[in-house]
Amino acid sequence: LGVVPSSNSEKLVDDLTPFAKALGDKLGMKVEVFTASSYIGVIEGIGSGSVDFGLVPPFSAVLSNKQSNTKNLLVGRSTSGKPGYFAEVFVRKDSDIKSIADLKGKKIAFVDPSSASGYIYAGAMLKDAGIDLEKDIQYQFSGGHDKSLQLLLNKDVDAVASYENVIRKYTKEFPTLKEDVKVIAKSELIPGVTVVASNNLDEETQKKVKQALLEIQNDKETIQILTNLFSITGFEEPNNDAYKSIEKISEKMNIDLNKVK
């Protein structure tokens, strides 16, 4: 089971291990959690078949679909009940930044070049506001949503791109986060966390994984693990048309989905 390093990799693997065990018990086989140092490392693993299936953000799903002919098995249902979530741009509450347009000349932390909420959709919002990412701002990739928040709270950057439930997710790590930051922009709906199967995983096992996940969502204790980590409360059939919005946004961001490495 491949997952992208959206937060501390070691902790992510540890937190997901009980979920992997529960899934393995349903499947009658051992399920191991795998992550890499970058989002693309997980996508490449799914493409090569060294990772059998992944629970990945939507942009990673589209990349693996395009580059490795993977199959979307299920999409996560967010805590809002929608089959997706929103990117948001955060600044410190004591900041005089009130809108995306105010970010001109500022320092921004994105998460990863392959992060939908942590870069691609937020970057598109900046472009829509007339901001040239290469000329009008200074930016860096932090490597994780938690790392971006730390940079913001430390005043190393003026703004960060993340997702709508990030404050709730990191309340333990940053107890005063809700009081310290504010949202200045919100994206259109992004397709949810997606279960993708490697092209090398046989169809019978794909069906078993899908069925096991649909059953496991009724186990409150086990699905709570995914709620805590990814803000999803269960799974549903993916609407593959919804992923076309990612292709349009990628085009706006000058990202060639066939060439991302």
Name each model feature, range by range:
Residues 1-60:
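Extracytoplasmic small-molecule ligand-binding "clamshell" domains
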Residues 2, 7-18, 24, 190, ...:
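An extracytoplasmic/periplasmic, membrane-proximal ligand-sensing/linker region
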Residues 6-9, 78-80, 92-97, 111-118:
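Short coil/turn segments
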Residues 15, 19, 38, 42, ...:
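Stable alpha-helical elements in mature extracytoplasmic
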Residues 25-35, 50, 127-142, 178-180, ...:
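A local structural motif
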Residues 40-54, 67-68, 101, 145-165:
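Short helices/loops that flank or line small-molecule/ion binding pockets
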Residues 44-102:
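Acidic, polar ligand-binding/catalytic clefts
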Residues 95, 106-204:
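Pocket-lining segment of extracytoplasmic ligand-binding domains
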